[in-house]
């Protein structure tokens, strides 16, 4: 594909150690010479890293700069790459369209801290996740937030996009704030839907 598009691959950014994110990294590196970046704290579970990074580190990716954010929960060593100047973030499996990654290693408290960190980003931030689970996540979101008019509309928009073989990601933080149940979990109206205490 790279040859067909006349593109060069010079950077591989790893968010976490799961096989669906790292299988093929060594082969890609050998074919392209791309440099591999990943979390220093998780290096023992990752392919050989050219750059080991930690929270707040700034790296160069092409002509852009990315800030490393610790985003544990899905896995303990999960990181995200925040391109502040472009309002883009590569979240891997920590935050997705209408959802977040399952807790394989972290706790609910750890994941909640990560989700609250995402809430601090500018609403115009574009979220590039590691998977496109938009339709299944929409069905779950509607099961816990059935009166959310924007969510109802979004589920229809997703159906239309998929019917036309179009992507549903990236998404914007602004849209996620309106429709993602994991980012809305502290809102009184959301808690009321689930008969949760407001504390």
Where are the regions that the model predicts?
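Catalytic core of the metallo-beta-lactamase
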Residues: 1-7, 46-145
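Intrinsic structural disorder
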Residues: 13-15, 34, 131, 166-167, ...
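Active-site HxH/HxHxD metal-binding segment of metal-dependent hydrolases
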Residues: 1-67, 153, 157
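Accessory terminal helices/loops
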Residues: 116-126, 135-199
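Surface-exposed loop/turn and secondary-structure junction residues enriched for glycine/proline
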Residues: 12, 25, 49, 56, ...
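Residue-level signal for threonine
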Residues: 39, 75, 172
């Amino acid at each position: 594909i790279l040859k067909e598009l006349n593109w060069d691959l010079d950077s591989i950014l790893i968010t976490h150690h799961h096989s669906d994110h790292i299988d093929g990294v060594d082969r890609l590196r050998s074919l392209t010479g791309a440099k591999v970046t990943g979390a220093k704290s998780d290096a023992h579970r990752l392919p050989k890293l050219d750059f080991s990074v930690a929270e707040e580190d700034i790296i160069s990716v092409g002509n852009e700069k990315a800030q490393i954010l610790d985003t544990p929960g899905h896995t303990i060593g999960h990181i995200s790459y925040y391109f502040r100047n472009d309002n883009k973030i590569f979240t891997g499996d920590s935050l997705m369209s209408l959802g977040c990654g399952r807790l394989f290693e972290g706790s609910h408290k750890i994941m909640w801290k990560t989700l609250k960190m995402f809430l601090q980003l500018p609403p115009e931030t574009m979220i590039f996740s590691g998977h496109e689970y938009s339709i299944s996540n929409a069905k779950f979101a509607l099961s816990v937030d059935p009166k959310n008019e924007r969510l109802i509309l979004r589920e229809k928009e997703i159906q239309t996009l998929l019917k036309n073989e179009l992507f549903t990601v990236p998404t914007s933080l602004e849209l996620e704030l309106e429709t993602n149940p994991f980012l809305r979990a502290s809102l009184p109206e959301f808690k009321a839907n689930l008969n949760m205490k407001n504390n």
